[in-house]
From Swiss-Prot:
Main localization (coarse): membrane
Transmembrane segments: 15-35, 53-73, 83-103, 124-144, 153-173
Name of the protein this chain belongs to: Protein TlpB
Pfam families noted in UniProt: MauE
Keyword Transmembrane helix part of the UniProt annotation: yes
Keywords in alphabetical order: Membrane, Transmembrane, Transmembrane helix
Source organism of the structure: Flavobacterium psychrophilum
Gene knockout outcome: Cells show much lower levels of proteolytic activity than the wild-type, has a longer lag phase and a slightly lower growth rate and a decreased final density. It also shows attenuated virulence, deficiency in gliding motility and enhanced biofilm formation. Quantitative analysis of the thiol groups of periplasmic proteins shows that TlpB is required for the reduction of these groups.
């Protein structure tokens, strides 16, 4: 019985740990390597203080090492001397980081990113998983005999370099840019009724008795007083580079991914609201540069086409905002943001709430 235990248990533990690390590495590249890794950088590394220059290198090397450890745990070269201790150390670092996140946020919400977007896991769940893995590795360390270790370091280096290089080939680092692509559909509708208040001009008696200069000075003052009570003062939203007229009037700004089912649902709900409301705020869309070939299908499912821009993945996440997720829907009035729906949980887009919001006068709105 003891012989069976000594022969099968170490291999069982090694297979489990290998599976854990390989799945973790692959999950961070799902559904497409560049998109998934860029998302991992923005959501997990940027909050830790990594710069836009360091994060792409660190993410690919880290995932490459994870994949390498998943493979190396199955072979015998420097297994007890090097591979197991490094694996334990890496897991301990993860536990330390996740414990800090848990201390700050409670740990019961959000996705720790251990398995990318494929298998969402809260920080507390990830801590438990990693502690169990550490105990298994410590047990494995004492189960294995020192004489079982082989000393071909070239195998270890070769596998590690191969996995890291493969990450850079699968998801090449792109030059950081904030440029955007102009959409082929740029059918921005222009209102026939412009936002101008024209002072009524009476007959000759007014023209002859009122000086022109006094009219020029008096009328704008009254107009400004009326506008100040009926709509907010203009501010810069930060999106004028994408949509030049976004800071004038009421707008619905959306952050969508063409292949995202939740984004399509939100867009469809917006279309239904717009069809029922002639004064609905103009809909503008910022698309992530991921699966852009699906944009025609996106609009077909939505039931309408809207002006849009396409921006690269990392600039898209930056524009969406730290801690925010798709779909994102903003209610903007004269450049002021009054509501920002995002994600698919508590703050997700709510068409009933949005309909009530856009019907409110300026005096009832809170930023």
């Amino acid at each position: 019985m003891e012989k069976v235990k000594s022969s099968y248990l170490p291999y069982t533990i090694r297979i489990l740990i290998s599976f854990l690390f390989i799945i973790s590495a692959i999950a961070k590249m799902y559904p497409s390597p560049y998109f998934a890794i860029s998302t991992f950088e923005v959501k997990q590394l940027y909050p830790l203080g990594f710069s836009e220059i360091i994060a792409p290198w660190f993410s690919r090397i880290l995932i490459g090492i994870e994949l390498a450890l998943g493979i190396l745990i199955l072979q015998n070269n420097f297994l007890r001397k090097l591979i197991i201790p490094i694996t334990i150390l890496l897991l301990a670092v993860f536990v330390g980081h996740l414990s800090y996140v848990t201390f700050l946020s409670g740990g019961n919400t959000g996705n720790c990113g251990c398995f990318g977007e494929l298998i969402p896991m809260t920080p507390i769940q990830a801590i438990i998983k990693n502690i169990i893995a550490i105990f298994l590795l410590v047990y494995l360390f004492f189960l294995l005999s020192k004489t079982n270790d082989k000393n071909n370091f070239y195998v270890v280096i070769g596998i590690t370099l191969a996995t890291i290089i493969s990450l850079f080939l699968l998801a090449p680092i792109k030059k950081n840019t904030n440029d955007f692509t102009i959409s082929p559909i740029e059918n921005t509708l222009i209102d026939s009724t412009k936002n101008e208040i024209i002072a009524p001009i009476l007959k000759d008696s007014v023209i002859t008795t009122v000086k022109v200069d006094s009219v020029k000075k008096a009328i704008p003052t009254k107009i400004e007083e009326v506008i100040s009570t009926t709509e907010p003062t203009k501010h810069k939203s930060g999106y004028a580079k994408l949509f030049p007229k976004i800071d004038t009037g009421r707008k619905t700004l959306c952050f969508f991914v063409p292949g995202c089912d939740h984004c399509r649902k939100a867009a469809k709900e917006l279309t239904e609201l717009k069809q029922k409301n002639a004064n609905f705020p103009e809909i503008l869309i910022i698309f992530m540069n991921e699966e852009v070939d699906l944009i025609p299908d996106f609009f077909k499912e939505t039931g309408a086409e809207y002006p849009y821009k396409i921006i690269e993945i990392i600039p898209f996440w930056n524009a969406l905002g730290t801690g925010k997720d798709t779909p994102g829907v903003k209610y903007i009035w004269n450049g002021n943001t009054y509501k920002y729906y995002n994600g698919i949980t508590d703050n997700k887009f709510n068409p009933i709430d949005y309909q009530a919001l856009i019907n409110k006068p300026f005096s009832e709105l809170k930023k």
